[in-house]
Amino acid sequence: YIHENIVYSVPTICQHAGALGIANRKTICPPLYEEYKERMYLAYERLKKLKHVEVLKPQGTFYIFPKISVPGMTTKEVLKEILEKTHVNLIDGEAFGPAGKGFIRIAVTVNKDKINEAFDRIENLEIFKK
């Protein structure tokens, strides 16, 4: 495996693209920050409307980490139901350590239409209406 790390590297074109991005970060990054901020607040506002969900106002990044506490269900059971009935895949917070138990992680890396579509499906689940 050492041989692979010495002989192989990131393709040259990717290295050039990365260098270009770093060199132009003052132009590229602000619109991206604004877009992710809008997506994050969209997800936050949609999560606040769901029963059995507690969410703190986001302060950065493109992840949001709400607490899910549906009576009579574990987080894994809730996530399984969401996936099976809505085809929306969310990550169990416990995957990031024991402190994540009862939480889920949502990445807002898709466009706002997709975020709204996912929440439209989730809001229709009975577990979030009871």
Summary of predicted features, one role per range:
Residues Y1-K130:
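PLP-dependent class I/II
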